[in-house]
């Protein structure tokens, strides 16, 4: 099971990724984790990547793909792998294709932006314990107060509506075109000897268990 998980920030990809990893016994490939590990280990690619990071520059796609190919050779990838948050752009998707990285499924978790804004901007956090609430879906017993300590809850900057909207704008511009890219490739079929992944789209609305059932149905 070799899979790319697509969906906007706040669509619930992280939760479903955990279910997929457990069911199929595959690792989640995070480019951020890979970069940190390569830099820490001082591998040739890690040293090269660190030079970009130290200058505050984006690590080039060619380097990221090199790290991906190294990571996929490891034993835990024998049964497959799950990409979450990569590729983010058409250029990265093209680079993956050119590098011959095989993918069986591209799964999109679709949630309307209005729902994502409500989900994320309604979150409230108790800073000391990390306990989280939601003003609509999981409110505290007393508005604005932690259930256990009675201390005030905060809204993290990441959860503020204007921040959420900005992240969704970036997704719309950069990552959403991948949905068309993979949908078109699935229609065309094999290219450069690489089998096109099957493209599946499911609704990310409803209870977590309902969404999980949809995910597993889509991956049959």
UniProtKB/Swiss-Prot annotation:
Reactions performed catalytically: AMP + ATP = 2 ADP
Pfam families registered for this protein in UniProt: ADK, ADK_lid
Annotated organism of origin: Burkholderia thailandensis (strain ATCC 700388 / DSM 13276 / CCUG 48851 / CIP 106301 / E264)
Subcellular location: Cytoplasm
EC number: 2.7.4.3
Encoding gene (name): adk
Pathway stated in the Swiss-Prot or TrEMBL entry: Purine metabolism; AMP biosynthesis via salvage pathway; AMP from ADP: step 1/1
Gene3D superfamilies: P-loop containing nucleotide triphosphate hydrolases (3.40.50.300)
InterPro entries: Adenyl_kin_sub, Adenylat/UMP-CMP_kin, Adenylat_kinase_CS, Adenylate_kinase_lid-dom, P-loop_NTPase
Region (NMP): 30-59
Domain of life: Bacteria
Task of the protein: Catalyzes the reversible transfer of the terminal phosphate group between ATP and AMP. Plays an important role in cellular energy homeostasis and in adenine nucleotide metabolism.
Chain positions covered by the region annotation LID: 122-159
Designated name of the protein: Adenylate kinase
Free-text comment about domains: Consists of three domains, a large central CORE domain and two small peripheral domains, NMPbind and LID, which undergo movements during catalysis. The LID domain closes over the site of phosphoryl transfer upon ATP binding. Assembling and dissambling the active center during each catalytic cycle provides an effective means to prevent ATP hydrolysis.
UniProt record similarity statement: Belongs to the adenylate kinase family.
Keywords, in A-Z order: ATP-binding, Cytoplasm, Kinase, Nucleotide biosynthesis, Nucleotide-binding, Transferase
Top-rank EC class of the record's enzyme: transferase
Region feature (Disordered): 124-150
GO cellular component: cytoplasm
Disulfide cross-links: none
Lineage of the organism: Bacteria, Pseudomonadati, Pseudomonadota, Betaproteobacteria, Burkholderiales
GO molecular function list: adenylate kinase activity; ATP binding
Gene Ontology process terms (BP): AMP salvage
Binding site for ATP: 10-15, 123, 132-133, 206
Residues bound to AMP: 31, 36, 57-59, 85-88, 92, 156, 167
Subunit field text: Monomer.
């Amino acid at each position: 099971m070799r899979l790319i998980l697509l969906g906007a920030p706040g669509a619930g990809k992280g939760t479903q990724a955990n279910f997929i990893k457990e069911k199929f016994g595959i690792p989640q490939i995070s480019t951020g984790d890979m970069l940190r590990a390569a830099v820490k280990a001082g591998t040739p690619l890690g040293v090269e990547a660190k030079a970009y990071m130290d200058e505050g520059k984006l690590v080039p796609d060619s380097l990221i793909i090199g790290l991906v190919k190294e990571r996929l050779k490891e034993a835990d990838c024998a049964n497959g792998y799950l990409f979450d948050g990569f590729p983010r752009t058409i250029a990265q998707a093209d680079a993956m294709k050119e590098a011959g990285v095989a993918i069986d499924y591209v799964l999109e978790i679709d949630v309307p932006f209005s729902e994502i804004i409500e989900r994320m901007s309604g979150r409230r956090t108790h800073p000391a314990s990390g306990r989280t609430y939601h003003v609509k879906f999981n409110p505290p017993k007393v508005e604005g107060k932690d259930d256990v300590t009675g201390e005030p809850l905060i809204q993290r900057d990441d959860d503020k509506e204007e921040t959420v909207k900005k992240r969704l704008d970036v997704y719309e511009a950069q990552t959403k075109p991948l949905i068309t890219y993979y949908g078109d490739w699935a229609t065309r079929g094999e290219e450069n000897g690489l089998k096109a992944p099957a493209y599946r789209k499911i609704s990310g609305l409803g209870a977590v268990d309902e969404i999980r059932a949809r995910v597993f149905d889509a991956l049959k």
